[in-house]
């Protein structure tokens, strides 16, 4: 797997989160999961990297309209993080499965 650095992952994730904040219905679309999975090739990725600073940057995308602000926070807090965690777990399992298969192939080819 070609590794992508954490800043690329963070930026891609912010684009996805921004889209979700603007249209929460995207949250239920399969294309969103695909877009997020494409961002998760960095094996050092940790779901906790969405800290206060990144949250502030995400909120800066939102207009000053208080209702829009509340809607965005609701989507981020109650929808996005569990979804991210689930996708990360799924991706990590895919990575583990792929690596174990690769290791077994390598040991077979190398004669043990």
From Swiss-Prot:
Binds annexin. This is 87 kDa annexin-binding protein. It comes from Physarum polycephalum. The lineage of its organism: Eukaryota, Amoebozoa, Evosea, Eumycetozoa, Myxogastria.
């Amino acid at each position: 797997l070609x590794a992508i650095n954490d800043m690329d992952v963070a930026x891609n994730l912010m684009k996805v989160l921004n889209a979700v904040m603007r249209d929460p219905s995207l949250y239920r679309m399969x294309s969103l999961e695909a877009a997020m999975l494409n961002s998760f090739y960095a094996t050092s990725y940790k779901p906790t990297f969405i800290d206060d600073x990144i949250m502030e940057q995400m909120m800066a995308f939102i207009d000053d309209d208080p209702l829009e602000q509340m809607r965005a926070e609701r989507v981020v807090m109650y929808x996005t993080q569990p979804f991210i965690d689930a996708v990360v777990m799924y991706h990590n399992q895919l990575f583990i499965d792929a690596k174990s298969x690769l290791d077994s192939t390598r040991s077979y080819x190398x004669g043990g």
